[in-house]
Regions:
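Helix-loop-helix hairpin linking two adjacent transmembrane segments in secondary transporters
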Residues: 131-174
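Juxtamembrane intracellular "pre-TM" segments in multi-pass secondary transporters
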Residues: 178-208
Length: 391
């Protein structure tokens, strides 16, 4: 189990590093390609668009295929497309290669979440999800700032390094992971639309996924323009932005690790709903902080709580379907990346209009509160359903 989890951790680390890498590089890439602030956000959104669009297809398809083979194939194309980002001669080519990297990642990430319940003992599933999530967090702590430091050599260097390391990871996946055959139900195959219909017919399930989408839209609206904000308001260079992001990632990882203990101590509702309200308030306050030390302190606290929330949300969504886990994992990931695409695009317009982080922070806070009400409505429907069955 340890070797399998190590591979899952490494996969999420590589995907996370590539996903989050663009944020601290945006000011540099904006100058390289001579594009406006509004357009620069599409270097984030193009990856998200490729991921979101194809995750919706990849998830249901993967429920009928060998997940190991999909991971090998997807990671191979991910390595190639990321490497090519470093060779992009123009803004449009960069968008194209980022889009293809997102498409490739769409065939890999859902397999990790869907394979955990199949390969890991039931009592260890939450822990395993936390370990995989920690891969994303550590990509912010180490991968993201290291990428920013590599960019001081040349802005293309991080893409080349990630591409080569991802190619080596393909070999590790092939050697370590067992064959993960599909679970056939009733001997018949279900088409893609029917899989989503089966999953989303239940209103409490569809509400939860929509709430997750709303939350991630707000999350990535803020995250995508942290680098631009730090560059403009505090005059930070790319490696200094990477250091600031290190603090952010450290908070996320700490939340992933200590989250289960905190939830057990203070209860699910306070951890989940209280955490959403708390982060919403901090996003409103963040733009008004003028000292970079206090900004980094708020980064740590914000993403410490977000790290807890992410584990709780993924556990909640994965428990909603024991049959179409690939479809559910794909829908969760697609929701996140569609949110990233829309959030980054809107944040670009808001930041360009205000030239500060106030509108972006308020937008994120508003969406967090909206997500809270949607999650609570979903939970209420679930409680009503259980009451009806009991009676």
């Amino acid at each position: 189990m340890k070797r399998v989890l190590a591979v899952f951790f490494t996969i999420m680390f590589m995907l996370g590093t590539d996903t989050f890498l663009i944020s601290p590089l945006l000011p540099t890439l904006q100058q390289v390609y001579h594009v406006s602030t509004e357009l620069s956000g599409w270097m984030v959104s193009s990856y998200a668009l490729g991921y979101a669009g194809f995750a919706l297809i990849a998830g249901p398809i993967s429920d009928g295929l060998n997940r190991k083979k999909l991971m090998v194939l997807g990671m191979s194309f991910f390595a190639l497309s990321t490497f090519l980002c470093g060779m992009a001669p123009s803004f449009l080519w960069m968008l194209t290669f980022r889009f293809l990297a997102g498409v490739s990642a769409a065939f890999v990430s859902p397999q990790v979440w869907a394979s955990i319940p199949l390969l890991i003992e039931k009592k260890q599933i939450v822990k395993a999800i936390g370990i995989a999530t920690a891969g994303l967090s550590i990509s912010q702590i180490l991968g993201l700032p290291i990428g920013a430091y590599l960019a001081t050599i040349h802005y293309t260097t991080p893409f080349f390094v990630i591409g080569i390391l991802s190619a080596l990871l393909v070999v590790l996946i092939y050697v370590v992971l067992p064959e993960i055959q599909p679970v056939h139900i009733g001997g018949s195959k279900t088409n893609i639309l029917k899989r989503y219909k089966q999953l989303l017919t239940d209103s409490k399930v569809s509400l939860s996924y929509f709430a997750y989408f709303v939350f991630q839209t707000g999350n990535f609206a803020a995250f995508s323009f942290f680098g631009v904000w730090l560059s403009i308001q505090f005059g930070l260079q790319v490696h200094e932005i990477g250091t600031a992001m290190l603090v952010l990632g450290l908070g996320n990882l700490t939340g992933n690790i200590f989250g289960p203990r905190i939830v057990n101590k203070i209860g699910y509702n306070l951890s989940f709903y209280g955490g959403i309200v708390f982060t919403a308030v901090l996003y409103v306050l963040l733009p008004h902080v003028k000292n970079i030390i206090f900004v980094e302190l708020l980064f740590f606290v914000l993403f410490f709580v977000t790290g807890i929330l992410f584990v709780l949300m993924m556990g909640r969504l994965q428990n909603m379907s024991s049959i179409a886990r690939g479809t559910g994992a794909a829908l969760a990931n697609a929701s996140m990346y569609i949110g990233q695409m829309i959030g980054a695009a809107i944040a670009g317009m808001l930041f360009a209009a205000s030239h500060n982080f106030i509108l972006v922070g308020s937008f994120t806070a508003l969406l967090y509160i909206g997500a809270l009400f949607l999650f609570r409505k979903s939970e209420k429907l679930s409680e009503d359903s259980e009451t009806g069955i009991a009676s």
